[in-house]
Amino acid sequence: MTRSLSALIAIPVAISAALVFIVGPSMAQGTGGISALYPGDEGIEAHPSVIFVEQFEEGSIANIVPRWGDARNPNGMQFSSDVPPGSPPGHSLNIPWVGGGVNSGGHLYKVLRPGVNDTIYVRYYIKYPASGRYAHTGIWIGGANPVSEWPDPQAGSRPNGDDRFIAAGEQNNVINSFEHYDYWMGMHPDGTGAYWGNFLLNNPSVQAGKGQWTCVEEMVKLNNPTTAFNGEHALWLNGVKVSHLGPGFPRGLWSGGRFTQDPAGSPFEGFRWRSASALNINWIWLQNYSPDDPTGFSSTMLFDHVVVATTYIGCLGATGAATPSAPTNLRIVRSE
């Protein structure tokens, strides 16, 4: 269900720190997305490239869960009247957590049928709290073969290539910046030989601001043919592309499971997400997993305006994107 829109004024939302601009293949950015055609996302589900829309406007959480499929701790979820700038009045989804092992958050997981065999874009809004030790957050994108009706990340193990992959972007609690968290058959082990999600940006200035709404968009492009390393993964914050990796770009330096984008480094090898055509993009996973806070701590994480499409979506607003403030201290990383 979408919101009624009577009047809408785009409110600029700035990324909260200096950004690194990644110069890669030409890709839509800022005002070029399909959201420009649907102010406030009203009616965006009618666009032919849109696969799924969730605006959390049902009468109850119980009415939302069936549209997704699998849910963890739905009884702990709530609606909030706090919505992003550019949104018509309505609801966002609040996933709270309570420290000391009482409640570590919750999730909504959706299987995409049919699966996507080329490129997918997922845009959503998230409001991180001002404090708290959240671990995994946002919306992860991935594939499973065979299709799984519930999350099965198999944390700490490298995919074989015909079984699964994960492409994610989240505010990272290890390096305290917004970061990739990716599992694929070509991922690198950490210094101990273990396989945890690879960090692929490593720039402390790239932040999803705490206590404010952030528009996040991800693009995942599968490798075709399955023998190629031409898969890609890109991230936008508030309409600004902050990372884009693919075959031969950007340059950077590997250290264990971390790739730091740096023009003095070697070209990124590209993603071979899969080795079998039966594996495609077939799930999204909205989650707040926050198990590490002490007894007595409680906080909330808000989500809104989820759109899944096969073309770039862009942020909310009368022009289809929130206009970010001009960042400073830019560093240009050129692809070759």
Predicted regions, residues:
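N-terminal secretory signal peptides that target proteins for export/translocation
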Residues: 1-10
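Positively charged, low-complexity intrinsically disordered regions
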Residues: 4, 73, 165, 332-335
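Bacterial N-terminal signal peptides
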Residues: 9-24
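Low-complexity, Ser/Thr/Pro/Gly-rich disordered linker/stalk regions
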Residues: 28-214, 218-319
